[in-house]
């Protein structure tokens, strides 16, 4: 189901037109969900899907112009010079970064945990912050966007940083 605002001018027309442009069936390579064959390259960008933090490190050292992504909801907002071919390292297939858990009265949130998945924890420990998360974009955005991404984009309109600062949150960064 779709939620949020839909443009009154175009409605579903662009979505329907895009689907109609698909000619025939789409065949994906036969490989497991976590297989390296999921890596893809085009003339304008490369996408890598590591399955471990170590593999992500390795990819970042082997490739220039690397950018880490998980939800990727702000990808179209970023401005990358046309002369640069970005190498995106997608972190959302790394199991350890998709975990959220409570430990010693703290919430530990992996870089690929979606905003939607944080809600039960914030509702339990910080209900006002849960309310902020519920107002964050549409349900589609919350199901894709991550707190890590919201912090890493350093957007002046980032919704999570002020609350996390007030809560005394800390961030563990690897590079």
Stretches with model-predicted labels:
Residues 1-175:
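C-terminal structural segment of proteins
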């Amino acid at each position: 189901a779709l939620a949020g605002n839909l443009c009154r001018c175009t409605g579903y027309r662009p979505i329907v037109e895009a689907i109609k442009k698909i000619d025939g069936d789409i065949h994906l390579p036969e490989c497991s969900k976590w297989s390296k064959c999921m890596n893809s390259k085009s003339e304008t960008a490369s996408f890598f899907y590591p399955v471990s933090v170590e593999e992500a490190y390795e990819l970042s050292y082997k490739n220039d112009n690397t950018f880490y992504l998980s939800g990727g909801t702000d990808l179209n907002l970023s401005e990358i010079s046309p002369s640069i071919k970005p190498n995106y390292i997608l972190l959302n297939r790394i199991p350890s970064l998709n975990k959220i858990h409570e430990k010693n009265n703290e919430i530990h949130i992996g870089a690929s945990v979606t905003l939607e998945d944080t809600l039960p924890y914030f509702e339990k420990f910080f209900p006002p912050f849960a309310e902020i998360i519920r107002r964050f974009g549409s349900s589609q955005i919350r199901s894709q966007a991550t707190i890590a991404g919201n912090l890493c984009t350093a957007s002046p309109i980032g919704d999570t940083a002020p609350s996390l600062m007030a809560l005394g949150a800390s961030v563990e960064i690897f590079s």
